[in-house]
Amino acid sequence: MIFTKSLINPFVHLSAIPTQRIYKTLNDIGLEVDSFHSLRAPDRVVVGKVLECEKHPDADKLNVCQVDIGEERRQIVCGAKNVAAGQWVAVALEGAKISDTLTIKKAKLRGIESQGMICSSSELGFPKLNEGIMILDSSIGELKLGKPLHEYPLFSDDIFEIDITPNRGDCLSLYGVARELAAAYDLDFSEYPKEQEEDNVLGIGRLLQVSHEGKLDSSLLYKTVQLNELKLPLSIALTLAYNDLLGESVLQNFIQYATLVSGVSIKAYRHDACLPASTSDEKPLKASIMIKKDENGLESVYAGEKKLSTIGVSQNRETMPLDAPEVVILEASYTPPAIISEGVARSKVEKETRFFYRASRGSNPHLPSGITLLCSALHKMGGALIYSGTHEITQNYKPATITVDLHSLSAFIGQEVPKTKVVSLLKSLKFEVDLASDDSFLAIRPPLFRHDIHNKQDIAEEIVRLLGIDTILAKPLYFAEKRRTDEEYILYKHHRSLAKRAMVAGFNETIHFVFNQKSRLKEWGYTTIDESVDLLNPITSELDTLRPTLLLSLLDSVVRNKNLGYSQIALFEMGSTYTAARQERFSLAFVASGLKKEAIYPYPKGEKWSLFGFAEEIASVIGEFSLEQRAPQSEKLFHPAQCAYIIQKGERIGTIAKLHPLAQEAFDLEETFVAEIDLEALKPSLIQAQSFSKFPKLQRDLTVLIGKNHPFSALRQEIKKLGIIEIKELFPLDIYTDEKIDEEQISLTIRLLIQSDSKTLEEEEIVSITQKVLDLLNHRFGAKLR
């Protein structure tokens, strides 16, 4: 946006403030100045009046003008098409330096002497207004013959071009910029112009009826005006030209000017275009307008079935007034910018920049200010007749109240700001401020035109803007890192700890897709995801469902490594698996295939994996566990005779098994062992310190004949039920059979580790303990001491 110091002065008096200071202030308050320069009409350019204008006798495109410059008359040859007698013009006299390359001198043009030059605005360094000379009028001030042009404020000015961020639509107007500067300098801001006194006794109700359908988000104000022959004042033309808004239509230029100054979005409709259809020869006098939502859900203006405009977005060009005497309907509108932006983005309708740009960033919601300014300009400068009254559709917009405590506000800012100063600064920006009963809290309501204020951080930013960032004392940043160890972090660290232990145990980590092939899973006996919740659009047919197990992918990786020539293959993976109902679980799986130790001394043939050796390595990762015999269910990967549940803390947390011979053959692998564990059961826990006994630990071995179908886990469970605290551990030591032992029995040696926490056990006490165990085994399992 481009403005000049003289354009701002009517709203806030900046005459006494140096231009360089204004430049710095604009940057300080967030209205970044893109460019800044002073523009002054050259010396020896004065106000003149064309008294006579005749065609040059020897040139079709030249005119010979007699120009009065006050003390004398000058003859000037001019080639402008629009020059005519009676015009007030800018005259460059002899010696005037118009540019670095042009100095005015007496000259003869086609034999006729010319004593100066009648100038256009662009020739004097100002924006281009038309194709001819610049015609002066009283809008720049009282015209006096011979008065230097640079003595008029409009032609000796300071030009600012500022960059307005998208959230500061309130500063897309002269009112907005003036309001900001008034707050920064603690100056009075001139309110909106007084309402124009209507001079037409006919009220708006005789010419226009306005209605609406349903609940609206927009506020609208309508006014009717009788236009006469319009003429655009020079001051308005120059103001618009600075911002590249000057167009061909005089009325549209007046509207653009009112919008630029006030920030109110304004449209004009031909009254004739809004009249209802008539079946008689008599033309109706009363136009009818309906506001309702269109097919895209955007609030629009209709006259009957004809759409006049979409509020804040576009206008039907057929409804735009011509620069001719007629009755015109003026419309000022406001819609909250978020509603406009979301509606246009959703419907993808075509938009006109001159409406949408301002509406989507936030136009001025005080509609009377724009309409009053426009009507005043049309009446005073264009001779228009203003009809009395208005039609208004007003919404009750209520800005949210933001509660801020002064301590937090000072913390945001970085230094203590007195309460009175905070209140004063906010009120200068037109905020409403209420103090709480304890004076430590402020209830703040931003003005409607500040749609960018939502929270206390925004309030702090407003205060810093006006205080000036340079006034905030610089000090070292103090911060203390907060403890960020939460459950998720602890779980993550636990999982990575398990992974590190697995790598120390010789397993390599792998990562696979969470997808697998449904037909292949069913082939190996796994329950797949129910069709109702399965993937609708799988990547490929080989990845058409979510995996219920990690083992198939791990076995595929084992095959790939074997084909690459590796003989020692030990892999693990942590990842998601899914139940039939598509509930996510987290699992940990291991696989070991081929040799455990390479074929080098002292293992010339290498060392093969065994189920117990595999279990021992897994125990080094997840901690000690016991095994409980498990018959394979639907899974076809597990060996029926070497398959067990993994028991930890009395709960089944997974399965360990040797690969079924048929599966081993199908995958073309050596002896392979697999395990899959519910990772959610391996919850992290703090190490619990426990006391230990200082007294000797003794071993006692019991060899019994017992039925071979009794699992050792059942024996262990029953012995623990005895509650003998001196038995610290028990485990199977040896199994023996020969022809002398019944084929339904085995010779089982159980080792007991016995220790007291309070004394050294006597032999009689040890014998008593072992006897209790023997009695239990005999009574519950029919075991006999061998």
Swiss-Prot record:
Q: Which GO terms describe its cellular component?
A: phenylalanine-tRNA ligase complex
Q: Where is it located? A: Cytoplasm
Name all tRNA-binding domain ranges: 39-150
Pfam assignment, any one: FDX-ACB
Which reaction(s) does its UniProt entry say it catalyses?
A: tRNA(Phe) + L-phenylalanine + ATP = L-phenylalanyl-tRNA(Phe) + AMP + diphosphate + H(+)
Q: Which SUPFAM superfamilies match?
A: Anticodon-binding domain of PheRS, Class II aaRS and biotin synthetases, Nucleic acid-binding proteins, Putative DNA-binding domain
An annotated GO BP: phenylalanyl-tRNA aminoacylation
The UniProt keywords, alphabetically, are:
Aminoacyl-tRNA synthetase, ATP-binding, Cytoplasm, Ligase, Magnesium, Metal-binding, Nucleotide-binding, Protein biosynthesis, RNA-binding, tRNA-binding
Q: Methyltransferase: is it a keyword of this entry?
A: no
Q: Which residues form the FDX-ACB domain?
A: 693-786
- EC no.? 6.1.1.20
The entry marks the following residues as binding Mg(2+), namely 452, 458, 461-462
Q: Kindly list the cofactors needed.
A: Mg(2+)
Residue span(s) of domain B5: 397-474
Q: What is its main location?
A: cytoplasm
A GO molecular function term, named singly, is: phenylalanine-tRNA ligase activity
Query: Origin, by domain of life?
Result: Bacteria
* PANTHER family xref list: PHENYLALANINE--TRNA LIGASE BETA SUBUNIT, PHENYLALANYL-TRNA SYNTHETASE BETA CHAIN AND LEUCINE-RICH REPEAT-CONTAINING PROTEIN 47
Return the similarity comment. Answer: Belongs to the phenylalanyl-tRNA synthetase beta subunit family. Type 1 subfamily.
Give the HAMAP family listed for this entry: Phe_tRNA_synth_beta1
Relate the assembly described in the record. Tetramer of two alpha and two beta subunits.
Name recorded for this polypeptide: Phenylalanine--tRNA ligase beta subunit
Instruction: Name the species this protein comes from.
Output: Wolinella succinogenes (strain ATCC 29543 / DSM 1740 / CCUG 13145 / JCM 31913 / LMG 7466 / NCTC 11488 / FDC 602W)
High-level lineage: Bacteria, Pseudomonadati, Campylobacterota, Epsilonproteobacteria, Campylobacterales
Gene behind the chain: pheT
